[in-house]
Regions:
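N-terminal, post-signal-peptide metal-ligating segments of extracellular/periplasmic oxidoreductases
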Residues: 22-201, 205, 209-211, 218-221, ...
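Asparagine-centered strand-capping/turn motif at beta-strand->loop junctions
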Residues: 193-197, 377-381, 431-432
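Active/binding-pocket-proximal capping segment
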Residues: 380-383, 388-410, 443-450, 461-468
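Short aromatic-acidic-glycine turn motif
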Residues: 210-219, 279-281, 394-406
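Surface-exposed interaction/gating patches
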Residues: 297-395, 406, 417, 423-427
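Bacterial N-terminal signal peptides
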Residues: 7-15
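Extracellular/periplasmic metallocenter environments
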Residues: 198-201, 208-212, 221-288, 412-506
Length: 571
């Protein structure tokens, strides 16, 4: 009876094992995500007029051609060059700028350009929580569907913060990064910060020649540091930061209140001091950075083109704080006391405020053979950037605005930028096997591999490209010879819902696996555990229930063994 019982148990276990093995051999079918089910965006923003790409003259400002998919607004460029006080109302109305956003007056040195420059900046929140509905307002995507909360310095604007009454998207002036500011050596510059935010802020002119105090001796509006130089600029207040730079170079400006969070949130931008030249009307603001379509006289003397490249990175945990609360006290508590930057992990990596594929829209370096191109590069992330250029080796000419000894200047293809560091690079497109390998679509990106991801998804991050004009299509996008890039312009890709290799072959061999036809792996494990426990339980039961019989049997066997040994000894 007992033998038959144990045989039945063994047969049952064998059957379960066989069923389980058979189920595990049945691979699920590949399931493809249909293109019709994707939330896809146009590769180029349809709201941007194709006419903006053309070389044109507005208000006497000769604006260069831009072959980018999303070129800068030429009316904004004209306003930045002439000043909002020196243009027509028709031009001003095309910009969203306030009439007093950029004031240019007084040719003090008589060389044909204004020398007294006033720039008004506001503090703006992007992708913050709104009490009006579930969601964030105004929205600014760094990639399709990716909306980290942010704060930026922005030019003083007129009208709505959104594109229009029906939209929740931020108007074109309200974006990452904070705008690039350009002034000339010797200019008397006033940056007026109007704190339109709900927390205190200041401006620190990082690397820019500026006084510790104003001429009247009052310690206010100098270095921007509340602990040593000035009081917090509270909500609703304004402050003037005045300086007259004596040295040219690529510098920074940023908030110096709770710098560990405010700078990371986006309150940092590039400020460039240009060399003094006659008739040197500058593009005072380069909103969004990238191609400089009205370069300075000094740049035109030595270079064919100029590009501003601002690298930044963001910790998702920090940037979600303003998406949880509307109460400034709770935001201040979480940022100042609960958030621990020593545990921070950067998740978003941007170039000029955007991540791939949006970098293809407006942060390409467009080149032609045999050119010299000026690249001004800044890193405002908390970690190093290892910028690598494919197909080219550029020369580092300046560190933090200071020219490196020309004899010792380094030509290489990886350029290391520490936090807050700036480099000036000369990109030579002469096809000599050293400076350039020839025409093509050549990536440039951070070679710390997490820098080319967006919240861990690749490709993403700060990837962009040096693209020769012959490789651009009619709308300003690279004519690549590889995969179709349209899938990267879908929300599903960045939400990890789109298998990136599903279309590599007709069979979809690397697509998403569907539902298994056999047992689910978790069910298999559960069954194994149940039957294993059942068998162990039966064995324990038999040992306990039959312990008397077992002991008698063991005793009998032991007695027989002893008896047998005794007989042998007597024999």
């Amino acid at each position: 009876m007992r033998i038959r019982f144990f045989l039945a148990i063994l047969a049952l276990c064998g059957s379960v094992t066989a069923i389980n093995a058979q189920a595990s051999l049945k691979l699920p079918e590949t399931v493809k995500v249909s293109p019709a089910a994707l939330n896809a965006e146009p590769i180029c923003d349809p709201k941007i007029s194709a006419s903006w790409r053309k070389a044109q003259e507005i208000e006497g400002v000769k604006i260069r051609e831009s072959n980018l998919c999303s070129p800068d607004n030429p009316y904004l460029i004209a306003a930045a060059v002439k000043g909002t006080n020196n243009i027509s109302m028709a031009t001003l109305m095309e910009t969203n700028l306030s009439p007093d956003a950029i004031i240019k007056t007084d040719d003090i040195d008589g060389d044909g350009d204004p020398d007294r420059i006033t720039i008004k900046l506001e503090v703006v929140e992007l992708n913050g929580k709104t009490p009006d509905f579930e969601g964030v307002l105004p929205t600014f995507d760094i990639a399709p569907g990716v909306q980290p909360g942010a704060w930026v310095f922005a030019p003083k604007t007129s009208g709505m913060s959104t594109e229009n009454f029906e939209s929740i998207k931020a108007n074109s002036l309200l974006r990452l990064p904070s705008p690039v500011i350009r002034v000339e050596v010797g200019d008397i510059v006033q940056i007026v910060l109007e704190n339109t935010h709900y927390l205190p802020h200041t401006i620190h002119l990082h690397g820019v020649d500026h006084p510790f105090t104003h001429s009247d001796g009052h310690v206010a509006g100098g270095d921007g540091v509340p602990q040593t130089n000035e009081m917090f600029l509270m909500p609703g207040e304004s402050r003037v930061y005045e300086f007259q730079p004596r040295q040219s170079g690529t510098m920074l400006y940023h908030c110096h209140v709770q710098t560990h969070t405010h700078l990371a949130m986006g309150l940092v931008g590039m400020i460039i001091v240009e060399e003094n030249r006659p008739n040197n009307w500058l593009q005072t603001l380069n909103v969004g950075g990238g191609h400089v379509r009205y370069p300075s006289v000094a740049i035109q003397e030595d270079f064919d083109e100029e590009f501003d490249l601002h690298y930044h990175a963001m910790d998702k945990e920090l940037h979600e704080i303003i998406q949880k609360y509307n109460d400034p006290r709770l935001i201040a508590r979480d940022m100042n006391r609960l958030y621990d930057i020593t545990d921070a992990k950067e998740d978003y990596f941007t170039l000029n405020g955007l991540s791939f594929p949006y970098t293809l829209r407006e942060s390409l370096v467009i080149a032609e053979p045999d050119q010299k191109i000026k690249l001004r590069v800044a890193n405002t992330a908390s970690e190093m950037v290892a910028l690598h250029t494919h197909g080219h080796k550029a020369t580092i000419t300046h560190y933090d605005g200071i020219e490196h000894n020309p004899i010792a200047q380094i030509t290489r293809d990886v350029y290391a930028l520490a936090a807050a560091q700036r480099l000036d690079l000369t990109l030579n497109t002469t096809n000599d096997g050293l400076h350039s390998y020839g025409e093509g679509i050549w990536l440039f990106h951070d070679h710390r591999e997490k820098g080319i991801t967006t919240n861990g998804m690749n490709p993403g991050g700060n990837v962009s490209a040096i693209v020769y004009k012959k490789y651009l299509n009619e709308i300003g996008l690279p004519m690549g010879l590889g995969v179709d890039i349209s899938k990267y312009f879908t929300h599903e890709f960045h939400a990890r819902k789109l298998p990136i290799w599903q279309d590599l072959d007709e069979a979809g061999s690397l697509g998403a696996p569907g539902v298994r036809t056999g047992f689910d792996p978790e069910i298999q494990n559960t069954l194994f555990n149940l039957f294993g426990g059942f068998i162990v339980g039966i064995l324990i039961y038999l040992i306990i229930a039959k312990r008397q019989t077992a002991l008698a049997t063991i005793t009998g066997v032991t007695s027989k063994l002893r008896s047998s040994k005794g007989d042998k000894a007597n024999g």
